[in-house]
Amino acid sequence: MSLIQHFDNMSSFLNDVHTLDKLKQVLDPDILEQAFKHAGVATVRKRRLPLEAVMWSVIGMSLFRNETVWDIANRLDISLPGKNKLVAPSALVQGRQRLGYESVQHTFQLLAHKTFSTQSFEQWCGLNLLAVDGVSFRTHDNQDNREAFGSDSNQHGEVSYPQVRMCSLMEVSSHLLLDSSFDSRRIGEMSLAQRLLPAVPDNSLTLFDRGYYSLGLLYQWQNQGDNTHWMLPARKDLQYQVEHSINDNDKIVILSTSPQARKKFESLPETMMARLTTYKVDGKSYRVLSSLIDPLRFPYEELTEVYTQRWEIELAFREIKQGLNHSKHTLRSKKPDMVRQELWGLLLAYNLIRIIMLDATKDEDILPTQLSFSQSMRQVIAFFMFTPIHSASKLPIHYDELLTTLRLFILPDRLPDRHYPRVIRKKPNKYPYKRKCQSVLN
């Protein structure tokens, strides 16, 4: 069901509309109810700051990164009517503790699953294109976070801030996050990627980074559902046997699994069949390994172009960190459970914006990724804050106006030959270097 249909369903019985009711149109109340029950926090008690309002304050922490949590709740006007118009800071702290992080996690996962199953996406050779990659977030430096998440270390001990390691599964053509998993810095990305297996949809191709080469993980991935394929760059030291050659640059190969891998993954066979494809870009050779062993369904010419789309998940991480999070290095929350809650709220806020962008491009000859995320984000925030709510029947009209506005923010075509090396500029020195000793200066 699209967001506009939620407007129609609610408008028949919303007479005296509150701001919280307007926000419920964007995030289906049924999803919230299921998430609260699943997390065991649902209650029949009527509070002035109900769980739905606390959920929106957690989402608002990402939409209004430079505002305090107290200001966010008051600007969104999410508390129910009462004697006091403003929400006390202590009430928000207690509300976040009542909400917990699992209810926000379930809300994110339910919304992502419902959106993917009801929307249509661009496909490649009949498969939905997905991507998996990891990213880290920095937390406040305190003992609780160090014990929960850990940090990098060197010969002198632990350094830097505690960090959360995250691994995400994303639909490429829309940047919609299907699921995420995060844990301590001590947990590797491949272990986190295994937790994403239940979210892998049928008829999909997942693009991995080179670091995810694990035959146990890849075997589980391709057997997770119907036509669940994978692709990643081949290592330089890859050991294989050629089963047969499709052409000089395209081969079906046999990969041998190690005893250690078979011990860790009980269902892993001694050998796996894969496809090794070689192609050139600007005179440089590249090799990709995949489970797409049918050359008739997946022609060589198509395989040489698809892997470049893995970079879309890097762009999505940039949108989250630089766009929503305003390039802030450290998350707001100071306790481990609240850090987890804030991260799930950040992913949920990102998906809500992406879902609205999906609605804006529906039945249009443009992709959601062709719209400017930063401009769309500002318009969505303005919709939440300034849309008049005196009449429920007007809400679908305002929402249509929002979608029309988003369609104006079409990005220019990407340059095909652009090149951005992974380097950083040298920072200028704040103070001049002292090149002579004090005795010479005197």
Where are these regions (language model features)?
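Single, function-defining residue in the core of a domain
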Residues: 1-69, 84, 96-99, 106-108, ...
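Short alpha-helical "recognition helix" segments of helix-turn-helix
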Residues: 72, 76
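Short, basic interhelical loop/turn and adjoining N-cap
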Residues: 77-93
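Phosphate-interacting basic helix/loop segments used at nucleotide- and nucleic-acid interfaces
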Residues: 114
